């Protein structure tokens, strides 16, 4: 029974590979979409907020406002988003520390 399971695992792992060379296809980079500077250029603020909110972001509204701020250049937006991420991370660490100490007290 074990051998059968391992055989199934081997078949499953090879069928789940995403490499085009297994199937005889090659990547054609000429037909790929070109990269854009602003990936949010064709979206509005509400749909971006909804996207962030649905992905579990607690600060979806603030993050969308930062992205759609007209008066900021790219570097300022990047710094603002990184600061928002750091604040969220710091709050998480504060929460975990408080939780750790509250467990020791009880």
Swiss-Prot record:
Task: List the keywords (alphabetical).
Answer: Apoptosis, Cytoplasm, Nucleus
Q: What does the subunit comment say?
A: Monomer. Interacts with NOTCH2 (via ANK repeats), the interaction inhibits the nuclear translocation of NOTCH2 N2ICD. Interacts (C-terminus) with CBY1 (C-terminus), TCIM competes with CTNNB1 for the interaction with CBY1.
Q: What does this protein do?
A: Seems to be involved in the regulation of cell growth an differentiation, may play different and opposite roles depending on the tissue or cell type. May enhance the WNT-CTNNB1 pathway by relieving antagonistic activity of CBY1. Enhances the proliferation of follicular dendritic cells. Plays a role in the mitogen-activated MAPK2/3 signaling pathway, positively regulates G1-to-S-phase transition of the cell cycle. In endothelial cells, enhances key inflammatory mediators and inflammatory response through the modulation of NF-kappaB transcriptional regulatory activity.
One GO BP annotation of this record: endothelial cell activation involved in immune response
Major location category of this protein: cytoplasm
Induction record? Induced by pro-inflammatory cytokines such as TNF and IL1B, via NF-kappaB signaling. Induced by cellular stresses such as heat shock, TPA, lipopolysaccharide and UV. Induced by mitogens such as thrombin.
Name recorded for this polypeptide: Transcriptional and immune response regulator
Q: Name one GO cellular component term.
A: nucleus
Q: In which tissues is it expressed?
A: Ubiquitous. Expressed in thyroid papillary carcinoma. Expressed in liver, expression levels decrease in hepatocellular carcinoma. Slightly detected in normal lung, its expression is highly induced in lung cancer cells (at protein level).
Q: Where in the cell is it found?
A: Cytoplasm; Nucleus, Nucleolus; Nucleus speckle; Nucleus
User: Which GO molecular function terms does the record list?
Assistant: Notch binding
């Amino acid at each position: 029974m074990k051998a059968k399971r391992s055989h199934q695992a081997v078949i499953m792992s090879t069928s789940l590979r995403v490499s085009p060379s297994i199937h005889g296809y090659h990547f054609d980079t000429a037909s790929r979409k070109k990269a854009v500077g602003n990936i949010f250029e064709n979206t509005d603020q509400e749909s971006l907020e909804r996207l962030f909110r649905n992905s579990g972001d607690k600060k979806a509204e603030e993050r969308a406002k930062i992205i759609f701020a007209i008066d900021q250049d790219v570097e300022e937006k990047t710094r603002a988003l990184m600061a928002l991420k750091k604040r969220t991370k710091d709050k998480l660490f504060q929460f975990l520390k408080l939780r750790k100490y509250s467990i020791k007290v009880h």
